[in-house]
Every structure is written in C-alpha cells, then in structure tokens.
Amino acid sequence: MKVIDVHAHIVFEETLNFLDKEGPEIGGDENNPWFRVGDYKLEGVRYRNTPFMDLGLRLEAMNNLGVDYQVLSPNPITYFHFIDKHLAIDYCKMHNDTMAKAILGHEDSLGGFATLPMQDPHEASKELERCTQDLGLKGAYICLLYTSDAADDVR
C-alpha cells in the first residue's frame, strides 16, 4: 500500500522578501528563529535547513518515515489574500512557478498545490487553470476567509 501525505507545507527561498514589507521574511538566530508575514511574526520555528524548505531533507525524511508521495502546499500564512490584488497576482505566479520547478524530476515522490490571488476571482480562476494545465500542479489551497466579502459574493 502506498503512503500519501497531502498536508505538506513548504516555503521557498525564492519567495522570501518578494513582497518587501509584507514578507515573507526569515530572521533571528539559532536560538530564536522567526518567520514574518506582514505584521504577524511566528517565533521559535526554524525554517531554513529543515525539510520545510530543503527538498533533499524532505525526501530523506519521507524515505525514513515510509512516505511514498507528498503533495506540497503553500504555508497558510503566505496565502496573502488581504494584500493588493496586483501584488498578490505577481506573488502567486512566482510561487506557483517555483513550486512546479521544485517538483520537476521528483514527480514519482512529489506533487504540488498552487496558491491563488483570491482578491480577484477572475485572476484566481485563470491562475488555477494555468497551474493545473500548464505547470502540472494538482490543484490549489485557499484560506477559508480570503476577503472581507462573503464567500457567496457574486463577483
């Protein structure tokens, strides 16, 4: 029986500081690492040199744990559903391109989920189509609360 993990968050080095003041940003030192997105700062969690950011370490950990396949997904605090839509569109495209490159050559072990610019449903739809049809990603992750509008807003 194949063991498949569909809840495997990842952060890519390429995404760090892409949005300037919004982040994402990693800082601190060995004893007090932190990860910041906007005004939110997650302290005490090491990202660099862990399976969270290093695919080699992730594949090694999967092997050691008997996990045959992981579908990588964006870190939920990097969905950026509340920033300017143009920035979100640029970030999502860059993140999704990076996701596709990361799994390239590891398709037997890794898949990927996209992140979408939910500020603009039309652009989110276009990006989902691009990610699944052109980049080979499996689908997308979104936050349940992605705008100040109701989920059934007709936009």
Set out the residue ranges of the language-model regions:
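Hydrophobic faces of well-ordered beta-strands that scaffold small-molecule active sites
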Residues: 4-6, 70-72, 112-114, 140-142
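Distinct, well-ordered alpha-helical segments
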Residues: 121-133
